């Protein structure tokens, strides 16, 4: 099953171009339009696969991400105090992931509803804004975690003052400010648009009207909040691996946690972040510059691959809790202790309720004068 769609048109624009028989929407019943027509524009062909892949991935991410990050936040708040510097970064990473997974039910419904958005323009903007805040917030907090571990492994004595919790708190506040300010243009670029068949789309990028300026903005954020952090992370990990090879850390917990950190973070980048940014850039270029009849089939393949990477980009919310468990400071040990304590408390409560029930039964028998017991 395939669905051929003309590009959606943004809400609230002039209808003059829409009435033009030469426009893609010329004979449609749509009541709004994009700004300026191009000589030729490829019609987007969506396959049935795209309607089911993303909601399936989002359901998986919501279930695993909600449970994993809920447990992580519970652990950091109630069982990990006093926090170390790396715990501060991991808590903020868990918080960013948790806020993102809370937005997924609306997206899941959107795709099961044949990509017809019913929640309004403001909710669409908020949805896309939170996705990008999570995406780049996660990247920057992973960079902070990597730099923190690098300082602890390569310069264990010199970095004692720099690795204090207070400094980590200041850096975390700065990261949130950078991300929120840097991503705030998404609130302008994203939004809803009306398709030819009167269904409403929620742009994951922007409408054709603002596409060229959005491409420039997207490249700036990609360089500043993806490429630069990736270079820093690779540099940190290269020096960490070198230090682990030349230092006598064969059986130390620091060596084990550092190795886990390198493996998990590089896996997240290789699976989630790198494919997403590559295909997002290619998709934007295709929409801008590859609008010829010969390129339409290629554009469809680029768009389909981009949709796959959108699902992969959300998987980091599932993987990050594994990072806390394997690479965090005493997280696994304290989680085990907390679950044992909760289990003992549950057993004690159950035993107490059982004893209370027995006493109540005996009391009722005595009040009724029954001495058969």
Swiss-Prot record:
Keywords: ATP-binding, Cell membrane, Disulfide bond, G-protein coupled receptor, Glycoprotein, Membrane, Nucleotide-binding, Receptor, Transducer, Transmembrane, Transmembrane helix. Glycans are attached at residues 11, 27, 113, 197. Pfam families: 7tm_1. GO terms for cellular component: cilium; plasma membrane. Its main location: membrane. Residues 1-51, 110-125, 189-214, 285-303 are extracellular. Belongs to the G-protein coupled receptor 1 family. PANTHER family: P2Y PURINOCEPTOR 1, PURINOCEPTOR-RELATED G-PROTEIN COUPLED RECEPTOR. This is P2Y purinoceptor 1. The gene is P2RY1.
């Amino acid at each position: 099953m395939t669905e051929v769609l003309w590009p959606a048109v943004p809400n609230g624009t002039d209808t003059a171009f829409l009435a033009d028989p030469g426009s893609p929407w010329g004979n449609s019943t749509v009541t709004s339009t994009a700004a300026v027509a191009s000589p030729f524009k490829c019609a987007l062909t969506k396959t049935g696969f795209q309607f089911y892949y993303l909601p399936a991935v989002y359901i998986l991410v919501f279930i695993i991400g909600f449970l994993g990050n809920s447990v992580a936040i519970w652990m950091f708040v109630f069982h990990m105090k006093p926090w170390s510097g790396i715990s501060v970064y991991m808590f903020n990473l868990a918080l960013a992931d948790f806020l993102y997974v809370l937005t997924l039910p609306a997206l899941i419904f959107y795709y099961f509803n044949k990509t017809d958005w019913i929640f309004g323009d403001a909710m669409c903007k908020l949805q896309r804004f939170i996705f990008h805040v999570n995406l780049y917030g996660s990247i920057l907090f992973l960079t902070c975690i990597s730099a923190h571990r690098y300082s602890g492994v390569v310069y264990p004595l010199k970095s004692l003052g720099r690795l204090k919790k207070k400094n980590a708190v200041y850096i975390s506040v700065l990261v949130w400010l950078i991300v929120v300010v840097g991503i705030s243009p998404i609130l302008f670029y994203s939004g809803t648009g009306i398709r030819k068949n009167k269904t409403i789309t929620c742009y994951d990028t922007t409408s054709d009207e603002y596409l060229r300026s959005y491409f420039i903005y997207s490249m700036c954020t990609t360089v500043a909040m993806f490429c630069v952090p990736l270079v820093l992370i690779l540099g940190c990990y290269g020096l960490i691996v070198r230090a682990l090879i030349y230092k006598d850390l064969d059986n130390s917990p620091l060596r084990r946690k550092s190795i886990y950190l390198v493996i998990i973070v590089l896996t997240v980048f290789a699976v989630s972040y790198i494919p997403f940014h590559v295909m997002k850039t290619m998709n934007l270029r295709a929409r801008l510059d590859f609008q010829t009849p010969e390129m339409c089939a290629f554009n469809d393949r680029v768009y389909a691959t981009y949709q796959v990477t959108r699902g992969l980009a959300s998987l980091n919310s599932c993987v990050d809790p594994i990072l806390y468990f394997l690479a965090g400071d005493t997280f696994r040990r304290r989680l085990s202790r907390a679950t044992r304590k909760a289990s003992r408390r549950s057993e004690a409560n159950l035993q107490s309720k059982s004893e209370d029930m027995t006493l109540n039964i005996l009391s009722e028998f005595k009040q009724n004068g029954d001495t058969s017991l």
